[in-house]
Regions:
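Short, conserved catalytic or adaptor-binding loops enriched in Gly and charged residues
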Residues: 31-39, 203
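Flexible glycine/proline-enriched surface loops and loop-helix/loop-strand junctions
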Residues: 39-43, 103-109, 153-155, 163-165, ...
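Conserved catalytic neighborhood of penicillin-recognizing serine enzymes
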Residues: 13-20, 24, 30, 132-192
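Ca2+-coordinating acidic residues in Ca2+-binding motifs
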Residues: 4, 122, 142, 222-225
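Active-site-proximal helix/loop microenvironment
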Residues: 8-10, 199-225
């Protein structure tokens, strides 16, 4: 009965608790219906898209990077999501502790980070949706945007250089900050927030011009899926 089931909740099998893919297994269990994860003692088989060979490559490669390039006492962390082009998650790493116990913090799905320029495609997707063309020309130049109740926003290009007239195609390819901000300001922030949501971004997206440069935090899984 239910009372008995609650006293003996579902647990990961021995195989699922092993180091390889444990972050993936924990994510699946955390995503399962509440009745399945906490109110059943029955044996349940859950079929997933996990690929142990890809997972082993991810863990081996990540371990090598940390051994060769990261100091032993460093607090650096890592998160990896491998997704095939059909949108299925094949491997996941939520931290440098590959054992990834049941209660380990999974950075692939729980950590919120600023995506930076990885958010720019949403700006350009919104532009295309509004009738802009890849050949539409914008002027790459220093800009200032007045924000009520705040300091003037003055985005700069990473290179410190300005190229003058550029197409949207080139602006995206060269990751030009000023054009992304201009475009977002012209299209309207709400349209960008809406299209990001349509692509699967569930984290809260800000309402200021800085979202064009990826200032709003998202998690790695939703960004990869988008």
């Amino acid at each position: 009965d239910r009372s008995s089931a609650e006293n003996f909740p579902a647990k990961l099998s021995t195989e699922a608790s092993q180091p390889v893919g444990s972050y993936f297994a924990n994510w699946i269990m955390g995503s399962a219906p509440k009745e399945l994860s906490s109110a059943t003692s029955e044996d349940v088989i859950i079929r997933t898209t996990f690929d142990p060979q890809i997972q082993q490559v991810v863990e081996k490669s990540t371990r090598k990077v940390f051994e060769e390039f990261v100091k032993e006492d460093s607090k650096a962390e890592v998160a990896v999501v491998v997704m095939s082009k059909d949108g299925l998650v094949r491997a996941m790493l939520g931290g440098r502790d590959f054992s990834g116990g049941v209660d380990k913090f999974n950075r692939a799905v729980q950590a919120l980070r600023q995506p930076g320029s990885a958010f720019k495609p949403f700006i350009y997707a919104a532009a295309l949706d509004q009738g802009y063309s890849p050949n539409t020309v914008f002027f790459d130049e220093p800009i200032e945007i007045e924000i009520a109740g705040s300091k003037t926003y003055k985005p700069k290009n990473y290179t410190g250089e300005y190229l003058g007239p550029v197409t949207l195609n080139d602006a995206l390819g060269k990751s030009i900050n000023t054009v992304a901000v201009k475009l977002a300001n012209e299209i309207g922030i709400e349209k960008i927030r809406a299209i990001a949501k349509d692509f699967g971004i569930r984290s809260s997206i800000g309402k200021g011009p800085a979202i064009a440069l990826g200032a709003s935090e998202v998690n790695l899984l939703e960004l990869t899926a988008a």
